[in-house]
């Protein structure tokens, strides 16, 4: 039986190649523009699964916000610290991460970091990220949707086991966690690499209303 790789192993191996293929997904760039329009000056932002730091941390730190990026891949964190010196990066897992900042974040961004988990871990990660959103703040997330449970696949040449939630499961979980969903949509992205086929992407924008 082929040993399945962890997310850290996959992204340590992929490095900047991941950014080359997925670093400028049009809907992700639109999501960043959406959140940037709504943040106050010097906002506190958490980038979950920050990768190389591009485009999320780079764009928001460049706009003057205080950005913290977390990623399970040591190689990605090292690269991000070099490419985006205006943000802070930590090697950390969303399942166990404890923010240093009291009072939460003005924005939590989560672009595709939850797939190499099981469904209960994804649900717990959504709950945790929602809890880090300060009143008046936002959560912007993207993933590959579907009621997927422990599916063994080959992705970018790496054997991994993936899970996900359907669109409705995501929306219900975020609402139960106290967020208001403002917008969501799905789209199809085709990376320019034969090892990465077309992907359905789910984007969701949510907020925690002030009392």
Task: Give the role of each language-model region.
Residues 1-41, 147:
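Conserved class I S-adenosyl-L-methionine
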Residues 46, 52-97:
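Class I SAM-dependent methyltransferase SAM/SAH-binding core
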Residues 99-108:
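A short acidic, Gly/Pro-enriched loop at the edge of an enzyme's catalytic core
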Residues 107-120:
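A short SAM/SAH-binding and catalytic strip from SAM-dependent methyltransferases
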Residues 123-135:
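A short glycine-rich, Lys/Arg-flanked "PGG" loop and its adjoining helix->strand segment in the class I
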Residues 136-143:
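Conserved beta-strand signature within the Rossmann-like core of class I S-adenosyl-L-methionine
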Residues 144-161:
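Short, glycine-/aromatic-enriched active-site segment of Class I SAM-dependent methyltransferases
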Residues 162-178:
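Short alpha-helix
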């Amino acid at each position: 039986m082929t040993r399945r790789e962890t997310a850290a192993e996959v992204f340590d191996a992929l490095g900047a190649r991941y950014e080359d293929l997925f670093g400028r997904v049009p809907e992700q760039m639109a999501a960043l523009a959406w959140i940037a329009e709504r943040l106050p000056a010097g906002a506190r932002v958490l980038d979950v699964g920050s990768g190389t730091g591009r485009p999320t941390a780079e764009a928001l730190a460049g706009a003057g916000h205080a950005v913290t990026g977390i990623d399970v891949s040591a190689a990605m964190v090292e690269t991000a610290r070099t490419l985006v010196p205006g943000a802070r990066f930590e090697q950390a897992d969303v399942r166990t991460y404890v923010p240093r900042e009291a009072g939460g974040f003005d924005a939590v961004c989560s672009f595709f970091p939850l797939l190499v988990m099981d469904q209960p871990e994804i649900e717990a990660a959504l709950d945790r990220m929602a809890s880090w959103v300060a009143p008046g703040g936002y959560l912007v997330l993207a993933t590959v949707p579907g009621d997927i449970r422990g599916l063994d696949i080959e992705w970018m040449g790496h054997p991994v086991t993936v899970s996900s939630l359907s669109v409705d499961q995501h929306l219900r979980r975020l609402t139960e966690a106290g967020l208001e969903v403002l917008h969501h949509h799905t789209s199809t992205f085709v990376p320019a690499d034969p090892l990465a086929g077309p992907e359905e992407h789910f984007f969701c924008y949510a907020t925690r209303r002030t009392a």
